[in-house]
Amino acid sequence: MEGFDDAGVFFSDNFGGDNQQDAQINLQAVKKKYKEFIRTFNEENFFYKYRDTLKRNYLNGRYFLEIEMEDLVGFDETLADKLNKQPTEHLEIFEEAAREVADEITAPRPEHEEHMHDIQILLSSNANPTNIRQLKSDCVSKLVKIAGIIVAASGISAKATRMSIQCLSCSTVIPNLKVNPGLEGYALPRKCNTEQAGRPKCPLDPFFIMPDKCKCVDFQTLKLQELPDFVPQGEIPRHLQLFCDRSLCERVVPGNRVLIQGIYSIRKVGKPSRRDGREKAVVGVRAPYMRVVGITVDSEGAGAISRYSNITSDEEEHFRRMAASGDIYERLSQSLAPSIFGSRDIKKAITCMLFGGSRKRLPDGLCRRGDINVLLLGDPGTAKSQLLKFVEKVAPIAVYTSGKGSSAAGLTASVMKDPQTRNFVMEGGAMVLADGGVVCIDEFDKMREDDRVAIHEAMEQQTISIAKAGITTTLNSRCSVLAAANSIFGRWDDTKGEENIDFMPTILSRFDMIFIVKDIHDESRDITLAKHIINVHLSSNKSAPSEPAEGEISLSTFKKYIHYCRTHCGPRLSEAAGEKLKSRYVLMRSGAGQQEKASDKRLSIPITVRQLEAVIRISESLAKIRLQPFATDEHVNEALRLFQVSTLDAAMTGSLAGAEGFTTEEDQETLNRIEKQLKRRFAIGSQVSEQNILQDFLRQKYEERTVMKVIHTMIRRGELQHRMQRKMLYRIC
């Protein structure tokens, strides 16, 4: 509990005794052991691990040494135990020992480099991390390991490690005063004890700091949030302030999942006074923070740092047997929200989204996303929100948000002013915190258009660029988006076509699969659905079954299997499957492969390159489910089928016509003809009855739906405007 009851005054102890000498001898012995560990620790092939690493780092200008705690335990268990229990004192000795060893192994140094730099000791451990909620007062001043997400990062500041002070009255200099590490400052002495004959005593508080005689290091403060896996239902995630110095600065950005090795410390709590607003320390109360001595970052964004990252060899063998079974795809889709009746293709699409395709880095440095985005459009009461809630539970990393309560800054990132330092700090939003997982956005249609536009970059490039308050940076948002939206009229109206939805083509084209979910009135289906819902409610009254139903996979196994597949498999498209997909793509673009299905016409809907990439991602996810290195013809066929029943079917209903690549050439010509006639019909600044226009075009044998589509498109472009309770059309430009 160091630093808890310090008086905050400068003092000098002039009464050293035998105990002080014994302590000094003991510290020298500890330093000797640390030096011996760095010099002599070797692995089986007689590779001197730390000695060689220290020399290589020092010569390359990296003045730090990373130590694995397991190696120190193997060398001297007592020494490792002391480092765990008294890290502040022992880290200082360890760094002195490393500096002396570095001095020996790098001598003789070149001219102008004779000065010896300080060495920073960084620690790492394979121990299981502690939850932030479990850090209590008995952990203070001890070495702990925690996991979490970085949500805010400050800029780089300087902190003095050694400083000199001077008396204003008598000019006495007290040099090389040691400043404790961490967020605790230094209390200047209140009195000057220098006595000079014939001079009055120096006044109170005469000392000032000499900046040019101080030795400083870089430091940065971070804000760590506990992992969503460990947050109890209905509670707010806990936060902890982190203090990083020297080589640990600027290693992470908001959104990174990290493992932190550090010293759980305390600092004074300031309370603003009523008189002048200045903060005054509250007596006896201390706020916790973590002085970081080691950081491990999950740089791949695959959720390697989560509750489900510890997979045993037995579980791994079980997962490989599951992948080898032929029905794993069906079993996984059946296990996805089993209480929801039907929606089999939607469940299969969401299963593919949970596993995702393979992220590719091209030779020119560009990236191709592997995450799959899915949009559910349709009637209320079709279990869209329930599916989103289940995905939040089953995905290893997931963030659930509602469209009405989400702003652009809340979804992407924001720049805020730190109330303590008054500096700007960056905080990541939902899509940054879900890096490597899934963002579930309910009520997607209720979002403001400006907020929806903010996630365009995050959905396709999977980055979020910030240029605010002098901070210009890019954050990762490598996550899938599962969105649910209702029709603009409440229920889906087949006669209205495109008017059912109010989305721009730019956002629609970023979704790999778009499902139109309709509440179909069918007696036999309604009877089956009613039975299923009644059974769900009746079974909920009984005690919960200990095992899932036959063929289903338990939630924990499902979650671990997703994590295992995402971290151990990155399939690519095979050459044969690529050739097949290429030929199918050409057929779909040209319209030669589609037959007329309806009585009037049912022409093929061409797809763009963006939709072709969507089919590739779906194929790779199907291969990943089976832990196969290549996506084959079988996977491509299923991917094309899913794409057919989702986006293509939605496009054929006319609901997505006008979006990128979602209109036939013949339809487009008809739309252009109607638009030209409309513009000739009435001049800019005039208004005409919408009913009269419709009747006029119907007499010319045009479909009402097609005419309404043109009017709706022109209104969206800002060329037309509804007036007088939507009865009149006014031409703006």
From Swiss-Prot:
Entry EC no(s): 3.6.4.12
Keyword Coiled coil attributed: no
GO molecular-function terms, A-Z: ATP binding; ATP hydrolysis activity; DNA replication origin binding; helicase activity; single-stranded DNA binding
Domain annotation MCM: ranges: 328-534
Chemical reaction(s) catalysed: ATP + H2O = ADP + phosphate + H(+)
Residues forming coiled coils: none
Domain of life: Eukaryota
Quaternary data: Component of the Mcm2-7 complex. The complex forms a toroidal hexameric ring with the proposed subunit order Mcm2-Mcm6-Mcm4-Mcm7-Mcm3-Mcm5.
UniProt-recorded name of the protein: DNA replication licensing factor Mcm5
Organism, as annotated: Drosophila melanogaster
Gene symbol of the encoding locus: Mcm5
